[in-house]
């Protein structure tokens, strides 16, 4: 699932609340939370309140730390999945992850340069990390929840978002105007949705949700 967020719409708080709820209601799920290039105080707050493994790099760390941490978390999640565990993998954010790999010369290896100075090769690993979510035939599953920033004013950030847009099974859009009314989570109901949601719900439930959605929108 991709959580599309404008600045100050509450993405990190939403991820923290989701992780806490999963830990309470599904204690068997292994939670891995990855924060990339985040503010130090945000890292401290997340680490204090989120159960599970929190792997974080703050914005006062060097570039290689961001990319190395992301790859370590990716490998860790895959090992747990292969061991038959149910894993919740949280990434905040795909935007900063893309920036880090784009600025790390080990991964931006001379592919086609897109608008905003984004090297196409640099997004290879972020795409792999986001695409690791799956429900295997045997025991084990991996659910991915990742945030992606929009409307930051940076052309490169918009390019990164476009590369991930539509690639998840669900897109949850947060609305800053709703957050400013102190309504949380600040979800844009019209912009959010799940692919083939009718296959996940009973016919009656799906009809009820559809009717409610039409009334609210």
Regions found by a protein language model. Give the residues of each.
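Short, small-residue-biased leader/transition segments that mark boundaries at the very start
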Residues: 1-2
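P-loop NTPase catalytic core
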Residues: 8-12, 16-217
């Amino acid at each position: 699932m991709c959580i599309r967020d404008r600045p100050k719409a509450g993405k990190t708080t939403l991820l923290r609340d989701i992780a806490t709820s999963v830990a309470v209601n599904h204690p068997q799920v292994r939670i891995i939370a990855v924060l990339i290039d985040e503010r130090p105080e945000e890292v401290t707050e997340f680490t204090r309140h989120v159960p599970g493994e929190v792997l974080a790099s703050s914005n006062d760390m060097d570039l290689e730390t961001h990319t190395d941490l992301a790859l370590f978390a990716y490998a860790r999640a895959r090992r747990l999945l292969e061991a038959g565990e149910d894993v919740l993998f949280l990434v905040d954010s795909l935007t900063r992850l893309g920036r880090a790999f784009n600025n790390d010369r080990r991964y931006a290896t001379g592919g086609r340069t897109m608008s905003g100075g984004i090297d196409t090769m640099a997004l290879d690993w972020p795409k792999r990390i986001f695409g690791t979510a799956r429900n295997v035939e045997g025991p084990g599953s991996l659910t991915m929840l990742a945030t992606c920033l929009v409307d930051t004013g940076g052309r490169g950030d918009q390019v990164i978002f476009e590369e991930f847009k539509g690639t998840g099974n669900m897109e949850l859009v947060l609305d800053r105007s709703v957050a400013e009314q102190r309504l949380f989570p600040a979800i844009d109901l019209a912009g959010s949705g799940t692919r083939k949601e009718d296959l996940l719900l009973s016919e009656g439930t799906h009809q009820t949700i559809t009717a409610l959605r039409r009334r609210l929108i």
